[in-house]
């Protein structure tokens, strides 16, 4: 009987001191629980869908080079980018193509800006498709340096794929990247 009385007191104390909070309130950015809980809760998919569809500043350079149509209804510059779009779209991973990203005084346009479908975490994906070309390779390394100077870390929040004529991008590899980072 003594244990029941102690248990009742504990319940009464808990109820009198417990703050009502919804799971959404616990996940708000100023909540002490947000960092702890966010990996385990999926933001509302409608929010991610809205983010994907919301107008954004895109790269306006060389629109005539966007010749490859995709299943997502956008045009991209290369077959490899169309492969990435196909798989992102197929796995329902929210993304933007060539979305403006401010890096200090420079505006970059990463190939893909991606939101993790469960956590909402932001990733960027650069596909470097002409690594045979020395000028292209130099520019790619310069871009990579700029990203790292602004907190975009390879394999953490910056995904990188490369190809040459001898070693083209492989669909199975792209699918593996998507599964490793976004489908767990």
Please state what every model-predicted region is.
Residues 149-184:
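Basic, glycine-rich
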